[in-house]
């Protein structure tokens, strides 16, 4: 293929990626954004295959076709069979694929540098820039791979969702980071691949030790950070391969993931480093002063909730992780339809870090065909709680905790929360009075205008619909 035509097609592919990502910012254009991004990827893949040279070689084309069919087949099966409630785990696994791909390409480049045109014929060693590229690619890729596997394991429940900490953890991570820099320098200076293999093994270990101390409450940020890592790893590999489309795509994914991480950290009033250092929510506190709460709560059932909702003129539903665990989104949609027919104004309030991945609640509500126009972000709806008759909270513990605004000793102090306590009545569906991932009790449970509905979220909502 002509070099100029190849460059133009890669540029078109990059533009499609940019427009596609931009379209994902709105639910109304998200589907179009996905299609544009798919088209961009298809163009990039076809151009890359043609650019290999002899595309008539049966072995080469067989390997390419086999890879496309195998990967596409697995992806299709996953997309069709995995429920939307498991999307955080899927995103974590997909991030790990990006990481291991970067590792494999970097390893291949070190093993056969001549095939990648990165071998200096005069010294019979990798070019200086190529040595740095492959080292960075394998470090970021390996950390992304092992870290994403740990994150997915935590989300799936295969690994404890609580922070796993041990004495000397932070000094150990710092020591490994310094060691990685030293190993890279030795590889670049000497060209001895032994240093490269050492830093590869160390990076895999770093991915584990960096993620295990991070608790479930911070998983949305971790997923965004690992997504960013996978993007930057891909961009670095793009330089090694000399692939413009891969550089553009990796840079887009990396930068957008980094920006999303910053936005979510800001939404929790946490710094990036405090999230990555982990340990948040590791000690379960009973209350603001460490004393277990013994105050009585107002308990209710489905009939009580139905009676209150029948008399309401306005309702705001606040979904949380409890909705995802119980897979209650479709039952909630039924409740919404029933109340709307009765003339009740129903809106949804979504906190930026509700759930276990960025946009977790939005994805689940979209699956249940909840209208995009009825879903509001924190800053757009917080002022409306004071004028709302009833708020229905479904397992959204920490993001509705008023102590974030009043208790300076609370771990979540300063985190923007939904002002649900200002509503006329708060119906809170929860299995028990247990604290959330932040490890602090929610004083909202004990307010006079709060009624606790202890049950599985899906069952309780279904019972409320029946009672209506």
Model-derived features with residue positions:
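Structural signature of hydrophobic alpha-helical transmembrane segments
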Residues: 1-14, 56-73, 130-145, 191-202
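Cytoplasmic-side transmembrane-helix entry/capping segments in multi-pass membrane proteins
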Residues: 31-40, 64-65, 86-98, 163-174, ...
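Transmembrane alpha-helix boundary signature
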Residues: 48-65, 77-87, 103-121, 190
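Transmembrane helix-loop junctions at the membrane interface of multipass transporters and ion channels
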Residues: 108-122, 189-194, 221, 228-248
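Mobile "lid/hinge" segments at catalytic clefts and subdomain interfaces of large enzymes
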Residues: 215, 230-235, 239-273
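Membrane-interfacial segments at transmembrane helix termini in multi-pass membrane proteins
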Residues: 252-312
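Structured cytosolic domains appended to multi-pass membrane proteins
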Residues: 291-468
């Amino acid at each position: 293929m002509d070099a100029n035509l190849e460059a133009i097609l890669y540029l078109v592919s990059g533009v499609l990626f940019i427009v596609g990502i931009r379209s994902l910012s709105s639910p109304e254009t998200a589907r179009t954004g996905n299609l544009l991004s798919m088209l961009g990827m298809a163009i990039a893949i076809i151009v890359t295959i043609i650019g290999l040279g002899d595309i008539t070689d049966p072995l080469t084309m067989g390997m390419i076709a086999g890879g496309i069919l195998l990967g596409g087949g697995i992806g299709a099966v996953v997309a069709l069979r995995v429920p939307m409630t498991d999307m955080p785990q899927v995103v974590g696994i997909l991030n790990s694929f990006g990481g291991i791909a970067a590792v494999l390409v970097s390893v291949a480049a070190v093993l056969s540098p001549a095939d990648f045109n990165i071998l200096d014929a005069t010294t019979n060693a990798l070019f200086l820039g190529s040595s740095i590229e492959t080292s960075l690619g394998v470090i970021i890729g390996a950390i992304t791979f092992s870290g994403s596997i740990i994150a997915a394991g935590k989300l799936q429940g295969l690994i404890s969702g609580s922070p796993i900490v041990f004495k000397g953890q932070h000094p150990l991570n710092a020591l490994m980071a310094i060691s990685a820099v030293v190993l890279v320098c030795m590889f670049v200076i000497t060209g001895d691949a032994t240093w490269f293999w050492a830093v590869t093994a160390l990076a895999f270990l770093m991915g584990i030790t960096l993620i295990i101390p991070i608790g479930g409450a911070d998983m949305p940020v971790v997923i965004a950070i690992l997504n960013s890592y996978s993007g930057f790893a891909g961009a670095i590999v793009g330089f090694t391969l000399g692939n413009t489309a891969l550089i553009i795509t990796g840079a887009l994914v990396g930068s957008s993931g980094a920006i999303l991480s910053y936005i979510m950290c800001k939404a929790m009033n946490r710094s990036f480093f405090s999230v990555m250092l982990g340990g948040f929510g590791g000690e379960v506190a009973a209350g603001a002063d460490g004393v277990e709460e013994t105050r009585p709560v107002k308990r209710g059932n489905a009939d009580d909730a139905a009676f209150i909702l029948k008399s309401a003129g306005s309702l705001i539903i606040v979904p949380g992780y409890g909705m995802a665990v119980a897979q209650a989104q479709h039952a909630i949609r039924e409740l919404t339809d029933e109340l709307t027919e009765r003339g009740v104004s129903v809106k949804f309030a979504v906190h930026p870090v509700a759930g276990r991945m960025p946009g977790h609640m939005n994805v689940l509500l979209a699956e249940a065909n909840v209208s995009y126009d009825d879903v509001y972000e924190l800053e757009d709806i917080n002022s409306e709680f004071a004028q709302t008759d009833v708020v229905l909270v479904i397992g959204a513990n920490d993001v509705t905790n008023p102590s974030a605004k009043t208790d300076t000793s609370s771990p979540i102090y300063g985190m923007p929360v939904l002002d649900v306590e200002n509503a006329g009545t708060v119906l809170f569906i929860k299995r028990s009075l247990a604290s959330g991932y932040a490890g602090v009790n929610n004083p909202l449970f004990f307010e006079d205008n709060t009624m606790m509905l202890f049950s599985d979220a899906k069952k309780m909502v279904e019972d409320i619909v029946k009672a209506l």
